[in-house]
């Protein structure tokens, strides 16, 4: 059991966490023909949009209610109604995600009442689903905001079971053959989600991914050239069939509450996994798919498993005993920590952006809830060879002279990293090779001493100072 160490500093010096509204917006960006609408100031939403654009290198559909100093005091309900009506009239979306921010939460905005006022004033937009999410900036992190959005999507868009799901025969009549629900966590990249879909379909199953960022944020050109709404993602019509699925697969402990809500509404049995990185986690997931599909392990999956095992043998000497420092949101931190621990590496520092109860189960002495400054201090104190963090950890890695493995959100200083697959047999194998190569090619050398009396050329003195 790991000890969870809470922060004692008065402020975050080098912030690790990203706000809840960004996480909630990310969840809606994984739905087809959707517009996330943040109820807050224009500048805050612009900053969030810039975060997404730098990470994904693509246009991002994101709007704001544009609260200002006047509406912050006297109320911004009219802004919300006007924004919803404008988006419905101009863009004709299937779904609008109405996300509160720290500003509107501190103001005390009554979002459900405002949505009711919009419905009363504009009944002709009744077909557009408006999903409100309470996601203040002052609590949680990207992962928790994302989880709140998924929970809201389940509550507002997944129909309740119309028959008694305790009666098997009556339920079987409405079950869609071989369809499974998949609750996808915030830690998964577009590459991860694509790999997960292929993994499930290899067993002859049809997954309904909620949400599906692989179909909307994987970086692809469209014939229209530009769309004001999300292009690609989970269809609203597919979400409305989730109560007829055969089973539900839940990835990540952050989605436990959303999984509970889905089980309450549909009565469908669910299978929960902390992560899908590493041989043991992959084997557990594959065995579950075998049980659901009622088939033996497909040869293609067995082939990938054998490739991963070979990679583990190849990389054991480089990763065994390596000293690693990891900083991420809770789900990703747990997945990476177990991955490195399974390969014989020593996780000397584990820093989470926000507190989560399941972090106590990790195979480390302590998990610090803090920022990247905490990571840097711990990594320096324990001589970490590898820093695993988002792009904001690059400066800490440079100062420490350690290798830097980029993962999480945001990644803005490396092309293609946002789309890498980390999960499954193939993703774990790729992560093994990348980590081993980083450690093998990164040398923490001591610079040679040069006497002040050394006689050398001006160029040599510039490149090799005393």
Where are these regions (language model features)?
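An N-terminal assembly and electron-transfer interface module characteristic of large anaerobic redox
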Residues: 1-466
């Amino acid at each position: 059991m790991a000890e969870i160490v809470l922060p004692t500093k008065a402020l975050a010096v080098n912030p690790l966490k990203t706000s809840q509204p960004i996480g909630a917006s990310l969840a809606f960006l994984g739905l087809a023909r959707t517009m996330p609408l943040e109820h807050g100031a224009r500048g805050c939403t612009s900053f969030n949009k810039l975060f997404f654009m730098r990470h994904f290198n693509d246009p991002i559909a994101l709007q704001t209610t544009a609260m200002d100093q006047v509406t912050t005091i006297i109320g911004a309900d009219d802004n919300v109604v006007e924004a919803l009506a404008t988006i419905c009239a101009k863009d004709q979306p299937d779904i609008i995600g109405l996300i509160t921010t720290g500003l509107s939460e501190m103001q005390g905005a009554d979002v459900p009442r405002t949505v009711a006022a919009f419905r009363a004033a504009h009944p002709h937009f009744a077909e557009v689903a408006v999903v409100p999410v309470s996601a203040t900036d002052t609590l949680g992190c990207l992962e928790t905001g994302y989880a709140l959005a998924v929970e809201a999507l389940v509550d507002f868009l997944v129909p309740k079971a119309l028959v008694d799901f305790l009666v098997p025969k009556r339920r079987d009549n409405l079950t869609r053959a071989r369809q499974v629900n998949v609750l996808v966590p915030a830690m998964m990249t577009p590459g991860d989600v694509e790999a997960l879909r292929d993994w499930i379909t290899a067993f002859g199953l049809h997954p309904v991914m909620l949400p599906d960022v692989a179909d909307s944020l994987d970086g692809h050109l469209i014939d229209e050239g530009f769309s004001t709404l999300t292009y690609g993602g989970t269809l609203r019509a597919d979400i409305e069939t989730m109560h007829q699925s055969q089973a539900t697969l839940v990835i990540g402990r952050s989605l436990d509450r959303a999984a509970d809500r889905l089980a309450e509404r549909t009565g469908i049995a669910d299978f929960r996994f902390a992560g899908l990185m590493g041989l043991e986690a992959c084997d557990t997931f594959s065995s579950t798919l075998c049980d659901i599909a009622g088939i033996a392990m497909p040869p293609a999956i067995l082939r990938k498993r054998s490739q991963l095992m070979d990679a583990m043998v190849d990389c054991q000497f480089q990763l065994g005993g390596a000293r690693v420092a990891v900083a991420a949101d809770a789900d990703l931190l747990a997945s990476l920590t177990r991955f490195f621990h399974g390969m014989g590496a020593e996780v000397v520092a584990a820093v989470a952006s926000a507190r989560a109860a399941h972090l106590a189960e990790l195979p480390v002495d302590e998990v610090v809830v803090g920022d990247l400054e905490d990571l840097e201090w711990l990594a320096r104190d324990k001589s970490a060879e590898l820093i695993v963090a988002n792009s904001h950890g690059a400066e800490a890695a440079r100062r420490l002279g350690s290798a830097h493995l980029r993962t999480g959100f945001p990644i803005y200083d490396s092309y293609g990293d946002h789309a890498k697959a980390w999960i499954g047999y193939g993703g774990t194998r790729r992560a093994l090779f990348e980590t081993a190569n980083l450690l093998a090619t990164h040398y923490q050398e001591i610079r040679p001493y040069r006497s002040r009396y050394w006689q050398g050329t001006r160029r040599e003195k510039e490149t090799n100072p005393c």
